[in-house]
Amino acid sequence: MKISVCVPVYEMKNGLSKRFLIEYLAHLMYQSYTDFDIVVSDQSENDDLKKICDTFSNVLDIKYVKNTSGIKNAANNVNHATKHATGDIIKLLYMDDFYVDRDGLKKVAEAFEKNDGKWLICGFVHCNQDKTKFFDQRTPWYGNKYPNGDNTTGNPSTYAVRKECLIEMDENLLWIVDGEYFYRSYYHYGDPIIIPEVQVCFREHEDSAFLKQEFRDLEVKERKYVEEKYKAML
């Protein structure tokens, strides 16, 4: 069972994108499961991140694709990555996050082989920018049965899905895009497969989107959009 690990990349301030991508790919080198490739969708204007991918291509199966859509949001970049994925399982893992379980991909493959579920979430922990402090470990659960954009699951780095069940992220959303994506997975495919153990780490850093007030200010507007969207569907 082949897994495509999809990573949307973009320019961050103070060179963080280059540092994070190097660490990201280095972590994947040590995964015990080897039947996987990495799909990198790059929104950045220069070739700095491409050069990093070219270097790691000597030891990892990397498919690098430039995203020239001009739409600078996470959902568009995720969708661009997943469109180029060929694995049986699509695994999302953001550039600033990383695996802390070297058997993580193996456990994802085994979970899909043993269960009929269409999508999956796993346990996660948080860390600071320099990975010197780890905190707020969480056991995954999916508790949002309502189309309001609430997110009880973490970010999409916990998420994997069978390729034939892949859905696109809503590119109209910035702040509650994750919660709506999880809800739509539930809406179409029911409850997720759950791996309770911690597999991935969410890194909090100076350029984290969830810290930016301009995104937080979108909450009321986006919740209304989501509620109206599902009124038309239900």
What are these regions (language model features)?
Residues F98, D103-F134:
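Conserved donor NDP-sugar-binding/catalytic core segment of glycosyltransferases
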Residues K13-Y30:
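Short, well-formed alpha-helical segments that are part of the catalytic scaffolds
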Residues I90:
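Short aromatic/hydrophobic "clamp" motif used to bind/position activated sugar donors
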Residues C6, P140-E222:
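Conserved nucleotide-sugar donor-binding catalytic segment
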Residues D42-K51, Y94:
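A conserved acidic beta->alpha catalytic loop
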Residues T68-A85:
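Glycine-rich, basic loop-to-helix element that forms the pyrophosphate-binding segment
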Residues L28, D42-E45, S69:
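Conserved short acidic donor-positioning loop in nucleotide-sugar-dependent glycosyltransferases
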Residues K2-S4, M29-V40, L60-K63:
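Short loop->beta transition adjacent to catalytic acidic/histidine clusters or analogous donor-positioning motifs
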